[in-house]
Design a protein with these regions (language model features):
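Mixed-charge (Asp/Glu-Lys/Arg
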Residues: 1-126
Length: 126
C-alpha cells in the first residue's frame, strides 16, 4: 500500500478531543543521497482530508522537496536522519541504556507485541 505505519494523534480532551489519523512512510536511504519528491508525492497522495502524514528518512530532504512541502502546504512532517539520531540519543540517556545495542535489542524484543495490522480508519475506534 506504500504506507509503513499508521498512528493516531489525540489532541484535547473530553468533548474537545480530536483524533487524527497519521500515515507514515519510512525509508532507509544512503546518507549522501537526498530524499526526492517521488516518494514524498506517493505519501501525500495517500492522505485523505484531515489526515496527517509523516515521512521518515535516514538521509536528508533535498531543498526542492522542502520548498514544495511548504509552498503546497502539505500536511506532512519531515523527519531526517539527524533528527532520528538525536531522538535515539535522548531516549538512551533518559532511560539509562548503556549502549545502542542494548537499546536496539529492547526495541526488537518489544516490536512484535506492539504492532497491529489494521486499516487507518480502524485506529479511530480505540
Amino acid at each position: 500500500s506504500g504506507i509503513d505505519f499508521v498512528g493516531r494523534l489525540d489532541i484535547g480532551q473530553g468533548f474537545g478531543k480530536a483524533k487524527l489519523i497519521v500515515l507514515g512512510q519510512a525509508k532507509c536511504e544512503g546518507l549522501n543521497t537526498p530524499t526526492g519528491g517521488t516518494h514524498i508525492a506517493r505519501t501525500v497522495a495517500k492522505l485523505k482530508r484531515g489526515w496527517l502524514g509523516v515521512y521518515v528518512t535516514t538521509s536528508y530532504f533535498s531543498a526542492p522537496v522542502q520548498v514544495e512541502i511548504l509552498d503546497d502546504k502539505y500536511p506532512l512532517l519531515l523527519i531526517n536522519g539527524l533528527m532520528i539520531a538525536q531522538s535515539v540519543i535522548e531516549i538512551m540517556l533518559t532511560h539509562g541504556y548503556e549502549d545502542i545495542d542494548s537499546y536496539l535489542h529492547e526495541i526488537d524484543t518489544l516490536y512484535e507485541g506492539l504492532v497491529r495490522h489494521r486499516a487507518p480508519e480502524e485506529i479511530l475506534l480505540d
